[in-house]
Curated annotation (Swiss-Prot):
Pfam families: UreE_C (PF05194), UreE_N (PF02814). InterPro entries: UreE (IPR012406), UreE_C_dom (IPR007864), UreE_N (IPR004029), UreE_N_sf (IPR036118). GO terms for molecular function: nickel cation binding; unfolded protein binding. It comes from Azorhizobium caulinodans (strain ATCC 43989 / DSM 5975 / JCM 20966 / LMG 6465 / NBRC 14845 / NCIMB 13405 / ORS 571). GO terms for cellular component: cytoplasm. Disulfide bonds: none annotated. Involved in urease metallocenter assembly. Binds nickel. Probably functions as a nickel donor during metallocenter assembly. It is found in: Cytoplasm. This is Urease accessory protein UreE.
């Protein structure tokens, strides 16, 4: 069975290389190694180094370079809205406090149907109604950063080298500052002042 060992994030997907799609709910979009069958019947083995979250529009690259694009499946959700932003923030806090996956938009929060949680949210003054739509819950900060880094690695390669050089410049500056501090080790500590990089004066400053 052909394998897929690489995720191509949606901004980097080339439509001409997409040969099939695979429709997955939010649970199935968090995988490391599993046999999959695409919507058009193509079978392949997802075999990643570590578990990763697949976003709608991402693609799985097969060993021969072809792509299978990911589609988020419609799911039974509830839409949570309030008449003011503070109540929506309060609802978000209670959802997060229970570690419930949630999708947050400007106007609403979406979660998987949960009668107990829905009753609690209504008690907080939120309007709760069932909807059917793709579910794209928020990811943890580390997962989001990792996905961003994976998808933008090539774009940032040159930028990273520039920062590397910049880091060395700072290192030399730190050593120079360290040497300056040693030169003043024997200096009378009664003067409590800082010497600037361009200070050419001696050590006879008097301070009020």
């Amino acid at each position: 069975m052909i394998r897929s060992t690489k995720i191509v994030r949606h901004l980097a997907v080339r439509p001409d290389r997409v040969v099939d799609t695979i429709t997955l709910d939010h649970h199935a979009r968090h995988r490391r190694r599993v046999a999959m069958t695409a919507d058009g019947g193509l079978e392949f083995l997802l075999d990643l180094d570590r578990a990763a979250v697949l976003d709608h529009g991402d693609a799985l690259e097969l060993e021969d370079g072809r792509l299978v694009q990911v589609k988020a499946a419609d799911e039974q959700l509830v839409e949570i809205t309030t008449f003011n932003p503070v109540r929506l923030m309060r609802a978000a806090w209670h959802i997060g406090n229970r570690h419930i996956p949630a999708e947050i938009t400007e106007e609403a929060i979406y979660i998987v149907q949960d009668p107990v949680l829905e009753a609690m949210l209504r008690g907080l003054g939120a309007a709760v109604k069932p909807v059917v739509r793709p579910f794209k819950p928020e990811r943890g900060a580390y997962e989001a950063a990792e996905a961003h880094g994976h998808g933008q690695a090539h774009a940032h390669d040159h930028h990273d080298h520039d920062h590397h050089d910049h880091g060395h410049d700072h290192a030399h500056h730190d050593h120079a500052h360290h040497d300056h501090a040693h030169d003043h080790h024997g200096h009378d500590h009664a003067h409590d002042h800082a010497h600037g990089a361009s200070c050419g004066c001696g050590h006879t400053h008097h301070h009020d």
